[in-house]
Amino acid sequence: MDAPKEWEGDNVRRTTSASLLRWWRATPVRLGVAAVLLVAAIGAAPAHAARRLSDGQQEAVTAMARLDADFYDSQEGLYKVRGGAHEPEAALWPTSQVLAAAIAVAKITHAPADLARVRRIIASLSHFVTPEGVYHARVIRSLRYYDDNNWVGLDLLDAAALLHDSSLLAPAKRIFSFLISGWDAKQGGGVFWADGHPDRPTVSTAPGITLGVRLSALDPSGSYREWPARFYAWMNSRMRGPQGLYWDHIQYDGQIDKDLVSYNQGVMIDANVAYAVRTGQRAYIEQARRIAAATAIAFPGPWRNRGNYAAFDAIYFVSLAHLSALSPGATNLAPARDYVRWERATAAAPRLARLENELLEQAAFVQTAAAVGD
């Protein structure tokens, strides 16, 4: 479907504060535009009453504590890519996923220590910051990846809502401006992968839809209305295949890599969820449901991915949780819960202890367990 040509202000108001509160309480990670609307429109989210955590939530809390113990270097103030005394510092991509995991846990517990962890990780982003106020891929001067910056921008909006800290909105806005600067106007659109890299992947463009739509809830200026719509239209005209799923990237020579990867579907589910909340149009929920249903057909059987793919799957599963929270029954969370059970058993096995001792994989487990674990 097309992006909206104008915002439906009355429809936004019809998305009641009660429904947004239900979504806030039910959705532990990457909260979508509803989190921003809650803080901006109806005040701070209420403190959570003491309650028993689900098994998945408790596993997420425990796994996050273990992640800190295994990977955090308190002297450097950074996480290491693997557990061990002489491992290198993690790059921005895994660090962004650790921040998303920390936000997920703090959203569950609201414990002072968990909120402090979120603040600490945000402060550590200063190691990656560029003179322009966006982020290098590594702690040394390196390329600026548009997709990595997308994840950080979404994390910052989630943290702004969670911590009631409006100072985090400015760097998120700078990231969105950076995305616009990466738009390839000469070759028909799409955001580049990185500085000087001509590939245009789905994950450089699609998360920018959600980022821009969420920012529009706070600042309805033209760029936050025009550019998400442009990104959305490009994704659906250039990157959507006949199955209704989204291909991976356009190469430097204009050829399309038609690989199907889980998180490319997840970011477009989230984009439609964001538009559904922002506009009140049911058609976006239906589009998100179609993507989820097509993904279930294209990715049959157990999900058993590792490394980067575990993080890709986490992004997809979290998007399903967002869709389910906004529209109960809209999608089937059983495969995601089966995935958590499999990872739980894997982590307990001596041969594969601690999910292969990879920071990115641990962060992925925390996010998935927090979002869908039973």
Task: Describe each region flagged by the PLM.
Residues 1-25:
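N-terminal secretory signal peptides that target proteins for export/translocation
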Residues 32-41:
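Bacterial N-terminal signal peptides
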Residues 47-49:
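Boundary at the C-terminal end of the N-terminal hydrophobic targeting segment
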Residues 51-101, 105-147, 151, 200, ...:
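CBM-like carbohydrate-recognition segments
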Residues 106, 160, 216-220, 276, ...:
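Short coil/turn linking the two alpha-helices of tandem helical-hairpin repeats
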Residues 115-218, 225-226:
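Extended ligand-binding groove/face enriched in aromatic
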Residues 195, 205-208, 212-216, 223-272:
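Active-site cradle of extracellular carbohydrate-active enzymes
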Residues 264-279, 284, 288, 294-296:
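Oxyanion-binding "anion nests"
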